[in-house]
Amino acid sequence: RGLGDVYKRQMYTHFDKRILSVTHDVTSLLSLGENVIGVQLGNGWYNHQSTAVWFFDKASWRNRPKFTAQLHLRYTDGTTEYLGTDSTWQTTDSPVIFNSIYTAEHYDAQKELAGWDSPGFNATGWYHAQETESPTETIKSQVMHPIRETARYTATQCKKINDSCYVYHFPQNIAGVTELKVKGKKGTKLRLKHGEL
């Protein structure tokens, strides 16, 4: 189960000067027995690859994405245990083979791993995570609200351009994420382009 309707948690900052941390209460997500924490790590603002007038692709901090977490467990007897990320975590490539805040996300559904974030998953062939240095020792709590889903819109119009191109019109100019259901042959490529009038 995910952590709600949030699409983008980590906000922009000068990553070589400070890192923004977020806190979540995961109590309701725990169950008796084995539990698993799964993370999908993207480039975000830290490893911005697309060129733009702001030159984020040339930022001094730009590097491979990194992740750290600490789980605080408070037991009924009053004791506390801390579990942190380290090299016992396991990692592999995901179906998201490219992602950029400005340009696109490339998703290969043939690489989906059912149950990868569930107890009992067979992670044979996965790699142990590599411990690495933080870009800075300054960690601050993120106080701004994350980007989250606030509404859903359905296309109101569909115009066929040719056998491989359709234009869908939505009733509102938004910043959002497209959701679609399709049927087709395995390996078929779909390309979504977003625009505004």
Predicted features by range, described:
Residues 1, 190-196:
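Short, surface-exposed beta-strand/strand-loop-strand elements in extracellular ectodomains
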Residues 2-7:
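Short, small-residue-biased leader/transition segments that mark boundaries at the very start
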Residues 24-190:
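Mature extracytoplasmic enzyme cores
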Residues 8, 12-32:
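Aromatic- and Gly/Pro-enriched, solvent-exposed loop/edge beta-strand patches characteristic
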